[in-house]
């Protein structure tokens, strides 16, 4: 009997130890049934600028639209020679070929193939000498193609011929600056570059800038270590200034000696003068990569760590599961069942590199069910897996029971992430019938995921007239063509039902936005659309209406004698100006007013809270009511199941039309149809404006100290000084594009003179001059009546043009290749 009891006791002990060991293993090491993604195979390509590597390029799996891919700018000196370094990793590079295209991609100017690549350490080196006659100060698209065993990988940069741009000096300075920040002793030398302003606020490492203190610039108490070094990427460069972006990774040890990972992005705007580099602007954002194994769980929420406060998140109706996106990764947390799941990530747990950790993609959470399943849309650059190197849109369904993210559909596109993001932020929604709705290339698409088919619901939608609800299940737009032109069309994407709102006779409608699921739109009369002397339109709304999909009016707002302008729609508040007409040309604001959202918050509302700690500074926390059951939930890693269906191919070629692209602070900021608004925006950013053919329309800080244009080369229609846009367009025909810069400052429009473009300037009711030159003290003005050129004081010129309304008209010559 004793032997039996002893044996039973031993078996019980073994069982208990085994159970405890298994539990310990699960909670401390987590269950790493990671994704089925293949490792990245595409090499990286970089430019070697005087022994400093710049402009790291990642491979695309298909040719891209040249005019919608501007990842970097590579300057050319008079030799037009470039050295490229290829990091092949584990791939065999069979050949290197390149082609130079006009930046709109319409014409190939040069193409060559190079088979003999020279091996230098871990890199392959290629020397290129461009033979084409390239125009100065004109961007061209350079496409590089690497022939691999896996196929062809494409790489893109813009090349531009500009003299004395000091590119290698700027790149070397950026590397010196960021490395010095990581060493407290070396960082002491950086103080002269900063413009610190004492605010008393807690350090926020996701928002460091040139006004931060030296201690904050040098990482305060975080004590980080460099994990993945950065390579400078030139975004803008000219004879005076340069803008450079640097991305790298850091690690830091928390109080428990556990490792935190941070993605860091820095922006530098610099000026080279008198053999020294001056820092004009500096911005740094550090964002923590979420790690479910760290101690981030509290009774009332979860700490996401150092990051910006604009969190993409969603909680299910039962308030049992919350999903959130951080640094390109999707996570879900279930406080009640003690689990945290990494639903989707391109990152490798170990032995990763920048190819898998690159965050040129984003995730839109569509739905979180009571069972914890998640529908989401992934869009942007695909770091690895079966779609490696594609820009595209993927629809996923995460099944929590299986712990698998199942790909339902994939749509490749040929525009870069910057442009794709502008469209997908407007609309990306999947209904419960497995239909995906997108805005792409100004078309509203419905994609049937089950049938792998697509249709266009509406063509030619203008972004300014399109609005969608917060969760994207409703949208509305102003119809711009056909029998329904001038109507507002609204759609419920869950039912696919639409309704029309028609204006009364003499009335006009404007879409404004959504409050909850209710449409906000404005009503005005034809005479409320005012046009000033320069042709700029302004709109005053008489009645603002909030209406549900069934047409029930929730709120109607009007103020007799006043017009609603400058409307801003937030989650809980509509803010606007009440304005009066100033003659028949403009509106003048009289006072502000608001409309509150009276809908009560749901019981499962999630709040974003900022907390602070001495080591990490400001951190972001998601606060909710669900109580956690453990301080150490089980961390799970979902597998990814790729679809075996064919890709859904849409026509994503963006229509040819006049557009002005504002680039600033390291990326695409906005797309404008009004060049004056584009210049005003670029001026605030310290950026540039390019047109559709990628000509420089305007650049901040690249104005020569003096310039004189020979009037002999100026078209007669311009010398006549007419500021009638239609007349100018007719006379210039195909030789140039008229650019209306009315509303800009004289200082801004003098850039056009610097670029040898004359500017027509209004001086009175029926008088004008043509600005043909300037120096430090004067403008040089051509009188169309006397046909004489004379100097006029700079301050007097500023005053003269301001009194006439700052009406400036110029033109940019058509490029003939």
Model regions and ranges:
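Short loop/turn segments that connect beta-strands within beta-propeller blades
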Residues: 335-338, 399-401, 448-452, 492-496, ...
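Core segments of small alpha/beta cavity-forming domains
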Residues: 40-99, 104-108, 139-222, 296-339, ...
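Beta-propeller fold detector
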Residues: 110-113, 282, 340-349, 405-413, ...
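Surface-exposed, charged secondary-structure patches
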Residues: 16-31, 67-83, 94-114, 119, ...
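N-terminal Sec-pathway targeting helices
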Residues: 1-16
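Conserved active-site-adjacent core of cysteine acyl-enzyme catalytic domains
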Residues: 708-817
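A short hydrophobic beta-strand element
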Residues: 140, 235-251, 372-378, 519-524, ...
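Exposed beta-sheet edge and beta->alpha loop/turn motif
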Residues: 241-279, 283
């Amino acid at each position: 009997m004793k032997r039996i009891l002893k044996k039973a006791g031993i078996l019980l002990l073994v069982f208990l130890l085994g159970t405890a060991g298994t539990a310990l293993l699960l909670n401390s090491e987590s269950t790493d049934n990671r994704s089925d993604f293949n490792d990245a195979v595409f090499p990286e390509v970089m430019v070697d600028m005087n022994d400093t590597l710049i402009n790291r390029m990642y491979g695309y799996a298909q040719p891209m639209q040249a005019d919608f891919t501007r990842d970097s700018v590579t300057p050319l000196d008079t030799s037009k020679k470039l050295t490229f370094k290829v990091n092949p990793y584990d791939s065999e590079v069979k050949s290197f070929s390149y082609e130079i295209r006009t930046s709109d991609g319409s014409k190939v100017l040069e193409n060559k193939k190079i088979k003999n690549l020279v091996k230098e350490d871990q890199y392959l080196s290629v020397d290129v000498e461009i033979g084409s006659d390239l125009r100065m100060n004109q961007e061209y698209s350079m496409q590089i193609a690497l022939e691999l065993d896996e196929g062809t990988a494409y790489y893109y940069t813009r090349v531009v011929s500009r003299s004395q741009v000091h590119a290698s000096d700027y790149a070397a300075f950026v590397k010196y600056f960021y490395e010095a920040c990581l060493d407290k002793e070396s960082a002491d030398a950086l103080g002269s570059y900063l413009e610190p302003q004492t605010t008393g606020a807690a350090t926020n490492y996701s928002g460091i800038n040139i006004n931060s203190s030296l201690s904050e610039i040098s990482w305060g108490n975080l004590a980080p270590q460099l994990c993945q070094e950065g390579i400078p990427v030139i975004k803008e460069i000219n004879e005076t200034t340069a803008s450079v972006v640097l991305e790298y990774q850091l690690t830091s040890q928390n109080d428990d000696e556990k490792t935190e990972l941070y993605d860091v992005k820095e922006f530098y705007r610099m000026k080279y003068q008198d053999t020294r580099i001056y820092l004009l602007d500096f911005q740094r954002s550090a964002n923590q990569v979420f790690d479910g194994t760290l101690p981030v769980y509290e009774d009332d929420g979860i700490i996401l760590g150092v990051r910006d406060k604009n969190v993409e998140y969603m909680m299910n109706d039962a308030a049992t599961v919350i999903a959130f996106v951080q640094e390109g990764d999707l996570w879900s947390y279930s406080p009640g069942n003690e689990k945290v799941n990494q639903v989707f990530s391109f990152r490798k747990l170990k032995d990763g590199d920048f190819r898998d950790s690159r965050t040129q993609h984003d995730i839109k959470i569509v739905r979180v069910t009571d069972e914890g399943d998640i529908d989401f849309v992934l869009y942007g650059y695909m770091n690895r897996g079966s779609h490696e190197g594609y820009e595209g849109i993927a629809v996923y369904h995460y099944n929590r029971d299986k712990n698998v993210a199942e790909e339902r559909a994939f749509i490749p596109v040929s525009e870069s992430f910057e442009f794709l993001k502008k469209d997908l932020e407007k609309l990306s929604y999947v209904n419960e019938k497995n239909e995906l709705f997108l805005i792409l290339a100004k078309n509203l698409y419905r994609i049937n995921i089950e049938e792998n088919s697509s249709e266009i619901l509406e063509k030619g939608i203008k972004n300014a007239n399109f609005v969608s609800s917060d969760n994207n299940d409703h949208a509305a737009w102003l119809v711009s063509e056909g029998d329904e032109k001038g109507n507002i069309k609204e759609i419920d994407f869950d039912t696919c039902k639409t309704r029309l709102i028609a204006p009364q006779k003499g009335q006009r409608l404007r879409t404004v936005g959504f409050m909850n699921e209710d449409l906000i739109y404005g009503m005005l009369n034809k005479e409320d659309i005012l046009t000033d002397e320069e042709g700029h339109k302004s709109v005053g709304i008489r009645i603002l209406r909030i209406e549900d999909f069934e047409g029930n009016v929730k709120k109607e707002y009007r103020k007799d004698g006043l017009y609603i302008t400058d409307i801003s729609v937030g989650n809980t508040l509509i803010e606007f100006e009440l304005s009066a007409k100033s003659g028949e040309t403009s509106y003048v604001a009289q006072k502000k007013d608001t409309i509150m959202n009276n809908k009560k918050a749901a019981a499962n509302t999630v709040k974003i809270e900022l907390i602070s700690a001495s080591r990490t500074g400001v951190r972001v926390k998601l606060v909710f009511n669900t109580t956690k059951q453990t301080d150490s939930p089980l961390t799970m890693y979902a597998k990814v199941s790729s679809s075996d269906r064919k890709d859904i191919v849409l026509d994503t070629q963006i229509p040819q039309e006049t557009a002005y692209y504002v680039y600033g602070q390291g990326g695409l900021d906005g797309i404008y149809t009004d060049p004056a608004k584009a210049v005003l925006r670029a001026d605030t950013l310290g950026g540039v404006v390019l047109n559709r053919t990628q000509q420089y329309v305007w650049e901040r800080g690249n104005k020569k100290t003096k310039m004189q244009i020979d009037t002999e080369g100026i078209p007669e229609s311009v010398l006549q000084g007419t500021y009638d846009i239609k007349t100018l367009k007719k006379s210039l025909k195909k030789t140039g594009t008229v650019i209306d810069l009315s509303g800009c400052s004289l200082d801004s429009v003098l850039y056009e003179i610097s670029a040898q473009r004359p500017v027509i300037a209004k001086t009175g009711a029926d008088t004008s001059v043509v600005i043909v030159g300037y120096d430090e003290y004067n403008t040089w003005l051509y009188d169309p009546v006397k046909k004489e050129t004379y100097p006029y004081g700079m301050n007097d010129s500023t005053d003269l043009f301001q009194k006439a309304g700052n009406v400036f008209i110029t033109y940019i010559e058509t490029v003939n290749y």
